[in-house]
Amino acid sequence: HLREQEGVNDPDVLPEYLRESYSYTDTLGPVSVRETFARVYGKDWNLTLDPSKLIPTVGASGGISLICSMFERSGEQVAYITDAPTYAGFTARAALCQHASIFSVDMDGEGPKPELMRKQIRAAREQGYFVPFYYTVPDGHNPGGFSFTQKRREEILAVVKEEGILIVEDAPYLYINFAAADKRPKPFFSMAPDQVVHLFTGSKIGFPGPRVGFLYSEAELEISEGQTVPLSELALVESSSELLFHNPGALMGFEALLHDADGQGGFTELQSMWPLAESKLVVYRENREILLQVLEQELGQHREYFGWTLPDGGFFTVFSFLADGVNGPVLTNDAMIEQMVMQHGLVVIPMYDFYPIDARQRDTGAGMNQLRLSFCFSESAGQARRDDMREAVMAFCVAAKALVGIAT
């Protein structure tokens, strides 16, 4: 029927890769996809990845849901350690479980403070919680607008090893990196693959629609009476029970991205994912430069009022109002957000919602003077995109000045 109606391939001569895509396969999806990804991704981070430990997920968000479900299933009271502020998608997922709580760790310009992390882990345990992991986005932190330093990563790793918990490393912006190659800090999973649950997504580097992702870990977990099993096996069982597997066709499409034409009518496997990411980085890098240039040009002489992060990776900078304006403190509350829309035609994202509840209890003003500014805009193309980006940042600068009472 399909051959007659649509002119598709004769099923008798269907290419094997298509037959595999739409037939029952290995429980983890097409083997070739995991093998190819393991080779290419592993080369970038000087690791030999075991394809059998790659669990396909629906983007990195699917990995977050999977790892949370795995530790929540026993019904035990669990406490998740995370940053203050942290990714809203993680706090939203954690909130779905009535017996899960978040213990957050305040950050400085290098990352979460190690001794505060240790304190929070122990505080959670003293209150009767099981603490399975620390969740973070260390590269291009969302929403923090910076990347953790190498020194701080090593300090964090020391704490989690001593305290016996895992790191869940959400890595959507690992390749959205603006630092020189020799200045980039190492991802956690390349430093200690047996201590880390690494979440990869293809969404930020050119394959957003199909939501392809992988969970990878070489950790071993104790399940009872000293018996240990690979975390990847438990994740596989959990994934099966939650029906979180990906479409094999989407995985095959992702595998195609990991190849390039060889000039002779065939294809060859990429030696790195950096060239693939560069097609997107060209746009993001330029957008970042426009954002930072205009902020400096328009607001740089008023540093007593304004500050912003200089992101080495990711999509965001955090903009802060540092001093009172002529009408008092500038609060990035709902009223201010509405004012930005109504008076200036600007949609901005306040930071306070990214702070977990316990962080706002410690500091009722957490994030109340900050906005998250994004530079991933790419709806228009070429010079039109550049002009649109510049116009938007200029409009924001006019609004920021108005909020503190600086004449324009």
Please tell me what each predicted stretch does.
Residues 1-13, 19, 236, 240-249, ...:
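N-terminal basic, amphipathic alpha-helical segments
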Residues 2-163, 168, 174-191, 197, ...:
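Conserved core of the PLP fold type I
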Residues 13, 124, 193-285, 293, ...:
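Conserved core segment of the aminotransferase class I/II
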Residues 31, 39, 48, 125, ...:
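PLP-dependent enzyme catalytic core of the Aspartate aminotransferase-like
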Residues 86, 248, 272-292, 296, ...:
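Conserved glycine-rich beta-strand-loop-beta hairpin in the small C-terminal domain of fold type I
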Residues 94, 160, 299, 340-341:
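A generic structural signal for well-ordered alpha-helical segments
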Residues 170, 353:
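Glycine-centered flexible beta-alpha turn that most often forms the glycine-rich phosphate-binding loop
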Residues 216, 318-320, 374-376:
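Short hydrophobic/aromatic beta-strand micro-patches
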